[in-house]
């Protein structure tokens, strides 16, 4: 699926895993993207406070969530978790967001940045950077649909 290139804005990108969330953000003109330290996921979602601090610190206006679809473009168990987390985060942060198919982003970041067997979360944040770069090139635009901040996937 091809989307229109989105309008420039400062965006946070999330690569959501079961243990950590990789983070990256772009400048308001979508020219440069930078990684942030990955955050640990907690059962009570206390990592949202850390994410909120980054949103405020960098004056970010929305976020994107990588959705790991399978080779055929179908939802996986992890994709459902990512989609639900994105909706939860949008409700907590009151920000618009979108989903991006992030199939193979971890493999690509490992190959592109030479990261192997990483337990620090660095590979997760580089994966978030790849997701962000994909969004900058392809979209979709962040939207609010029917009062809920989401894009149907």
From Swiss-Prot:
GO process annotations (BP): rRNA 5'-end processing
Q: Which SUPFAM superfamilies match?
A: Ribonuclease H-like
Localization per Swiss-Prot or TrEMBL: Cytoplasm
Q: What is its main location?
A: cytoplasm
EC number(s) recorded for this UniProt protein? 3.1.-.-
Q: Which HAMAP family match?
A: Nuclease_YqgF (MF_00651)
Q: Which NCBIfam families match?
A: RNAse_H_YqgF (TIGR00250)
Task: Tell me the function of this protein.
Answer: Could be a nuclease involved in processing of the 5'-end of pre-16S rRNA.
According to UniProt, the name of this protein is Putative pre-16S rRNA nuclease
Annotated organism of origin? Prochlorococcus marinus (strain AS9601)
């Amino acid at each position: 699926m091809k989307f229109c290139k989105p309008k420039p804005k400062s965006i946070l990108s999330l690569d959501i895993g079961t243990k950590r969330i990789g983070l990256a953000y772009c400048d308001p003109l979508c020219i440069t993207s930078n990684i942030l330290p990955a955050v640990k996921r907690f059962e009570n979602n206390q990592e949202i406070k850390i994410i909120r601090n980054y949103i405020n610190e960098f004056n970010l206006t929305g976020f994107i969530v990588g959705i790991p679809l399978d080779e055929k473009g179908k939802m996986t168990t992890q994709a459902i978790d990512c989609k639900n987390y994105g909706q939860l985060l949008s409700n907590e942060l009151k920000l618009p967001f979108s989903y991006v198919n992030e199939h193979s982003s971890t493999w690509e970041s490992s190959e592109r940045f030479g990261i192997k067997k990483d337990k620090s979360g660095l590979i997760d944040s580089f994966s978030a950077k790849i997701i962000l770069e994909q969004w900058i090139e392809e979209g979709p635009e962040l939207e609010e649909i029917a009062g809920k901040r989401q894009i149907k996937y």
